[in-house]
Amino acid sequence: MIDSVRIRHQGSMDFLSHYEYLCALQDSVPIPAVKANIRHGSLSFNADRIKLSDWLPILNSLKINKSLLNVSIKSCHQPGLGEFGAEKYGIYFKRRIPPIRSKDMTFQVCKAITSCLSVSGSLKELELHGLPLRERDLRILAKGLAASSSVESLSLAYCSCGDEGLEIICQSVKNSPTIKTVNFTGCNLTWRGAEHIASIIKHQATRRHSEAWAESLRYRRPDLDCMAGLRRVTLNSNTLVGDRGAIALAEVIGEDLWLKALDLRQCGISNEGAQAFLNAFQTNTTLIILDIRRNPLIDRSLLKTIIERVLMNAHDTNSEYKWYTSPSSKDNGKVRQKWRSINNWNGRKGKNIVRVGFSTKKPMVIGRKYSSKELYCPDPRPPGAEGFLPWRTAERAKRHRDVSGEWASPGKADTAVKVIMDSETSSESEKSDNILSILDQEYAVPGSGEKKSVKNYKCLQLEFENTRLRQINHTLSESLHSRTATSVILEDEGVLDSIEKSFSKFHAFLDLLKDAGLGQLANLAGIDQSDFALPGDPQMSSTIDKIAQQAPMPHQDQQETFFIHQAQSRDKKGEHTGPSESNALTADTLPSSREADKYCTTSQKSKEGFDPDLKAREANVNSGRLPALENAQTYLYDKKGSRNECSASDSSRSQRSSLGQKSKASASEKERKPSSKRSHSSGTNKASQESIAARDEKAAARSNASISESEIQEKMNSSESMHSGSH
């Protein structure tokens, strides 16, 4: 590869190395201002400080470069102004005009920029500030903008291109797929230039509407932010735009969905143009910045209304487009004070002070009546006189008392005179600038929330959590203190309800026994029929009395049941007991009361299960028990005739038991019939049933004999004990 081609190829990717190489070829020193920001991908310098011989390496390096991100060339030269201090010395000379102000140099700069735009795919921002661009320069620059595929921001501020030059640039901007921001501040534009901008916005809106329709097919949602076109237009400091240009722009932005910011400061807009913008916001919801400040013909109330509407569109979102800030009034107030010595009013030359600056004290108004305190000014006294106070001491005392000493009365020799020239400290433009700062606090302009520190947010979270815990603690303490006797009463009522429910369940159980034909168990337990009433009025007194009177009865029944089941078990095993064996059973062989109770409960459960065989056996036992009890009663009357009272009570007791046994027998016969039907339906043999019945009859006869003898023996023992107790 040829060396020149290799160097050119390397220079396209490294501006600094190629620039230094070209400077070395022409034996010149690289300018430090040019190399200052190259490392950051930015070429930014003041063109007024560049000599004609130094422009050639810069332009040749810029033509072939493909790596720069930002190109900014500025010129701040003000033609027609003499050097400072020329009047003082009486010397008048013309300032040296920098080479950038010539038409040949501006044309060469525009050609180099056009070449860079054509070959570069990384250049994003192009700024030409204060260059006197002619029509020829703008035409060649428009070709580069049309060929560019990467530039997004174009700024031609203070380039004095006019309406004709703007029309040339607009032809390239209209069809550019990448340019989003244009800045034509101070370009001597009129309402015609505003119409050119409006035509660009309208043309791009029509094209983007068609693209949005195409992307919305098949139920898709078009992304408006990704579409090409202008997003911000800046036309500040073009005083000839006026209301006509403002109305042309307002008509376009009313239907636009893509423009985000429009800057029109110092454009000669009055209330008519401002009202047109306010009407446009009835349909526009995407414009988040409309800067019409510094237009003194707009009322403050109308300006505030428009800015409020703009901030409502912003929705406190963090946008990439920000409001341009104006210089604060504090910076404007910092004016250098000039001091010089003049003759005092008495004709003597003394130390007098003249201060030219801004006064914090209001000036004296002619025709206004002031109080004696405001007009009081003591006469100065000569040195050495009583009450003399040096002026320096007086000034220090006034400063300590925060009293401004702008006005001092004229005095004699060696006295200081301070003269203050007041000027207005506020203007209509500054008032309009302050509106945005006030509204920022009320509506939170986008980006202001980012300045809040994370520590404050965490502190707020902790305070909120502490408040919530305090409220919970307070609620719990109040609930503990509010517990009174009523809650205890309610708890007692709950206990009573549970007891009542248990009684109702018990009475329901007794009703089930009665419905099942097992009411005799309740009679044996000593529970009267009156106890089967509703649980609302429990009648347990009769039950308690009968249990006290008939205490030995349950034990006796348990013994009888024990003998019955013992006899049945013997029959099942095939053992045959005679009368002698049954007589041999005495009180020593009887089971204990605990075993009898346990056996009684098991027998009751078997009865609740409706066992037909067991009920049949009980019926046989009860039928055989009746003659035995009658014989025992006759025997007791014959043997103990003298004891009529005891025998009478025994006979009545035996009669009651006999009646109970008869009822049991009748109930068992009724229950035996359905049981026999069920046995026939199940398919059992008649022979097995007859053998079981014969076996049951034999067991019942044996148990009746044993029970009758045991009952007779027990009744004799009880009668003897009662007789001995009476004696």
Curated annotation (Swiss-Prot):
Polar residues bias spans: 579-592, 703-727
UniProt keywords, alphabetically: Cell projection, Cilium, Cilium biogenesis/degradation, Cytoplasm, Cytoskeleton
Nucleotide-binding is among the record's keywords: no
A GO biological process held by the record: protein localization to centrosome
Listed GO CC annotations: centriole; centrosome; ciliary basal body; cytoplasm
Superkingdom of origin organism: Eukaryota
Biased composition (Basic and acidic residues): 568-578
Disordered: region residues: 567-613, 636-727
InterPro entries: Cep78, Leu-rich_rpt, LRR_dom_sf
Cell compartments where the protein resides: Cytoplasm, Cytoskeleton, Microtubule organizing center, Centrosome; Cytoplasm, Cytoskeleton, Microtubule organizing center, Centrosome, Centriole; Cytoplasm, Cytoskeleton, Cilium basal body
Coarse class of the protein's main subcellular location: cytoplasm
Entry function: Centriole wall protein that localizes to mature centrioles and regulates centriole and cilia biogenesis. Involved in centrosome duplication: required for efficient PLK4 centrosomal localization and PLK4-induced overduplication of centrioles. Involved in cilium biogenesis and controls cilium length.
Annotated family: Belongs to the CEP78 family.
Protein name per the record: Centrosomal protein of 78 kDa
Gene this protein is translated from: cep78
